[in-house]
Regions:
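Short, compositionally biased low-complexity segments
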Residues: 27-33, 109, 137
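General secondary-structure edge motif
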Residues: 12, 16-20, 35, 78, ...
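Ferredoxin-type iron-sulfur electron-transfer modules in oxidoreductases and energy-metabolism complexes
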Residues: 1-30, 46-76, 206
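Hydrophobic or amphipathic alpha-helical targeting/insertion segments
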Residues: 33-46, 146, 170-177
Length: 226
């Protein structure tokens, strides 16, 4: 439906239809592998497949440029508080919908910025971090509060609700959306060799450096020359 609206030049309608089922098309429009395009039935009629990924991105950029996207805080709050643990894609989606329903939402994350693997696992050439920041600013303007550098001991053997409330305070409900920040190791020959590293570790480190986060080190050497 949103592709049809786009075809007819109705950009704002396309935006409304698209975001009715996807809160963050500006993310999926950049990083989705677009597997659906390979199965598009238009190819059976000598046409090119629909460019869903590029269309999503174009619709959202037009929406930002034309100010279709503006802060829309809920008119009425329910009086209920929800804590979302994890500011990755799942946590952000949960926070977005809960806030729209009128809940008071607090998002907690161990990192210094929101986004999870969107920020720390995907290179800038695929997803510029300004795109993430733009969305986070909108969510803040709608009343969602973000708390960074907060580690919740969910993996502890002695984990309890008392520990959870001690770490982030008492809420009416909790959404655990910590995601998968750890890479899946491979049990293959040569994995134990020196110099063989997991790609996710490398991507995370590189993205953190680009964000201005220096890795822990006792000594820092700076070389300058002409």
């Amino acid at each position: 439906e949103w592709n049809d609206a786009l075809y007819r030049g109705k950009w704002e309608l396309a935006y409304k239809i698209l975001t009715s089922t996807n809160p963050f098309p500006e993310f999926t429009g950049r990083i989705c592998p677009a597997l659906c395009e390979k199965s598009c039935v238009l190819q059976l009629t000598m046409h090119e497949p629909t460019t869903n990924r590029e269309d999503e991105c174009a619709i959202m950029e037009r929406a930002w440029q034309e100010s279709y996207i503006v802060p829309c805080p809920p008119e009425k709050r329910t009086g209920k508080s929800v804590a979302v643990i994890g500011a990755g894609p799942a946590g952000l989606s949960a926070a977005w919908y809960l806030n729209r329903q009128g809940q008071t939402v607090d998002v907690y994350d161990a990192n210094e910025k929101a986004g999870g693997l969107l920020r720390y696992g995907i290179p800038n050439f695929k997803l510029q971090k300004e795109v993430i920041d733009r969305r986070i600013h909108l969510m803040e303007a709608e009343g969602i509060q973000f708390h960074y550098g907060v580690r919740v001991p969910l993996q502890s053997d002695s984990f309890s609700m008392e520990e959870l409330e001690k770490a982030i305070g008492k809420h009416d409900a909790y959404v655990i959306a910590t995601g998968t920040p750890t890479a899946r190791d491979l049990n293959i020959p040569g994995r134990e060799l020196k110099g063989v590293h997991l790609a996710l570790d490398l991507l995370s480190q590189q993205n953190r450096i680009l964000e201005g986060e220096l890795p822990d080190a006792k000594d820092l050497v700076t070389a300058q020359g002409k």
